[in-house]
């Protein structure tokens, strides 16, 4: 039974899987967006968010922990200097996964995992207009419609008489 065994194995050995995710996290922070399969993106999200949380802490121990996982020292510097301050006010949810479809060769579902960049601003409620300006604006349109209706010639009313079948008319003419 597979109880209490979290995470995906992805068909790799433990050392291969750890090395792959270290490379992917380094690439994600270097480029801020990478394309991969859905399963890898979902696993990578948790690792990347833990690294950003370390970056938000910002102390020496956090720097050393991140440096032990991320392969490039320039990327560690970027994480602590530019990426982590971007999310100071945000509690989690630093990454976004966008599904792309399937890969043509092996039909693997592909996704883009990227760092969320937008800044959330408080929305200002729009107040309803209280001035009767809308009613004044519609009056000329109503008057134009009335004038146009008065200018059109009225069709005379025609009485509809009994409709005769064309076949009967032909027979009547033939007699």
Curated annotation (Swiss-Prot):
Classification via Gene3D superfamilies: Ribosomal protein L17 (3.90.1030.10)
Coiled coil: none
GO molecular-function terms, A-Z: structural constituent of ribosome
InterPro entries xref list: Ribosomal_bL17 (IPR000456), Ribosomal_bL17_CS (IPR047859), Ribosomal_bL17_sf (IPR036373)
Subunit details: Part of the 50S ribosomal subunit. Contacts protein L32.
Family of the protein in this entry: Belongs to the bacterial ribosomal protein bL17 family.
Record keyword 4Fe-4S present: no
Chain intervals for the UniProt region annotation (Disordered): 124-175
Classification lineage: Bacteria, Pseudomonadati, Thermodesulfobacteriota, Desulfuromonadia, Geobacterales
GO cellular component labels: cytosolic large ribosomal subunit
Compositionally biased residues, Basic and acidic residues: 161-175
UniProt keyword list: Ribonucleoprotein, Ribosomal protein
Protein name as catalogued: Large ribosomal subunit protein bL17
Any one of the GO BP annotations: translation
PANTHER family listed in its UniProt record: LARGE RIBOSOMAL SUBUNIT PROTEIN BL17M (PTHR14413:SF16), RIBOSOMAL PROTEIN L17 (PTHR14413)
Ribosomal protein found in the keyword field: yes
